[in-house]
Regions:
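Substrate-binding N-lobe of the ribokinase-like
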Residues: 21-86
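Glycine-rich phosphate/dinucleotide-binding loop and adjoining beta-alpha-beta core of small-molecule
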Residues: 1-7, 60-176
């Protein structure tokens, strides 16, 4: 029988942090998330990374998203990206994104893949492909990042992979 999940149970399974540690001791997450129409996804992504113990969290996104997230979560670092014609993250931002120091890349929430025009969907596929293959750490592919990766694979391309592990986090609708 599984144990009852209580606050005490959860706290007993969270390791104590060494007194001499600092935020750099607990990893750095780079979240590539959000678009002009989907700002909340980026905010929830960053908040989740911070709450689960990431030492440093950087959000790579377009200005309206960065403004909304920084007002709510001032501890988040920001990587401003060039906007595309529809308020998305332009692939022109890939070199800037890859220059960020991170141990984990999270890509996908709020990119708006399913709501995009054909041109914008192609740009999102480019983001996913180049960011994953150019990343030296582990990566989490979620939401619209999964949809873009599925589209790449449906076109006969291999699933792009980072240097370390790739974690896929589909919900039931994304698994079909």
């Amino acid at each position: 029988m599984a144990p009852e999940i209580t606050a005490e149970f959860v706290w007993s399974h969270i390791p104590k942090r060494p007194r001499e540690s600092n935020k750099g001791s607990f990893g750095a997450v780079l979240a590539v998330a959000g678009s002009a129409c989907y700002r909340g996804a980026a905010s929830l992504t960053v908040e989740g990374a911070l709450r689960t113990g990431a030492g440093i969290v950087t959000l790579a996104s377009v200005e309206p998203v960065l403004a909304a997230v920084s007002a709510r979560l001032p501890e988040c670092c920001l990587c401003p990206c060039e906007p595309g014609a529809e308020g998305e993250i332009s692939p022109q931002s890939i070199p800037r994104i890859l220059r960020q120091k991170a141990t984990v890349l999270l890509i996908g929430p709020g990119l708006g893949y399913l709501a995009q025009s054909t041109a914008r969907a192609a740009e999102t596929r480019t983001l996913v492909k180049k960011l994953l293959t150019g990343f030296s750490g582990s990566a989490v592919l979620d939401a619209d990042g999964l949809n873009a990766a599925a589209s790449l694979m449906n076109a006969g391309e291999e699933l792009p992979r980072p240097a370390k592990e790739l974690i896929l986090t589909p919900h039931p609708g994304e698994m079909s």
